[in-house]
Amino acid sequence: QSLQDTAKRMIDGGKKVAYLSNDVMQHSFYASLPPTEHGSYSVAFLKKHGLPPARQVRIGVEGVSERLRRSVSKPISDEDLIGCTRWLNANGKSVRWFMIAGLPGETDEDWQHLRDIIQRWKTLTPKGVLALSFTAFCPDPATPFATVALDDGYWTRFLDFREWFFSGREWSNRVKIMQPQQPDSRLKKAMLSMGLSELQLREGGYISPNSRLLYPYA
C-alpha cells in the first residue's frame, strides 16, 4: 500500500515514475499500481484506473493484418485495434502502432488489409493522431521463425503502401508512417544475429550456431 500511495502521489505531482523489477508483473500487487508513462496495460485496467500522463500510447500490433497477427499468437482483431485506438484518441492521446513488415507468409493482400483499416480509422475518428512504425522482420536465434528463409519482398510491398499513402486522397497529416529497415541493413543485422551467411539465410533451414535450442521442425 505504501508503494501504491507513493507512486500515485508522485504521478499526481507531475513526476515520471518507472517501476524497476526483474519482472514487475510477477508481484501480486502489480495490477493495483497506478499506470505510468512506461508500462504494459490492458484496456480494462486503464479504463478502471485512468490513463497515464503520457501524450502518446504505443501498441505492439506486430502483423500488418489480423491473419498475420494470429499466425504469431497475437490475435488482435481489427475491431479491437480500431476501437482501442479511437478510445485513446477520444481521451486526448495520440497512438502509435508498432508493426513488423515481412513476417513469414506475408502477401500483398495483408498490406491491402492494412490500407483498409487505416481508412476505417480515418472515417470513424474525426479527431486524433495515428502513427505507424514499421520494423523489418529479422530472424533471431532460438525463436520459432529462426530457420525461415529470408525474403526481401516486404520492401516492395512497403514501397507500394507508401506510394498509396502519399500519392492521392489517402494522405492525411493525422497519420504518420515510419519506414522499416531496407533489405541491405536488415541482412547485415540478420547475419550478425544468426551467425550465418547470406546464402544460408536466403535458403533457410539452417540452425544458428548462436542458438542453444533445437526446434524439431528445423
Identify the role of each PLM range.
Residues 4, 8-12, 29, 89-90, ...:
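Auxiliary Fe-S-binding modules of radical SAM enzymes
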Residues 1-131, 139:
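Conserved SAM/AdoMet-binding glycine-rich loop
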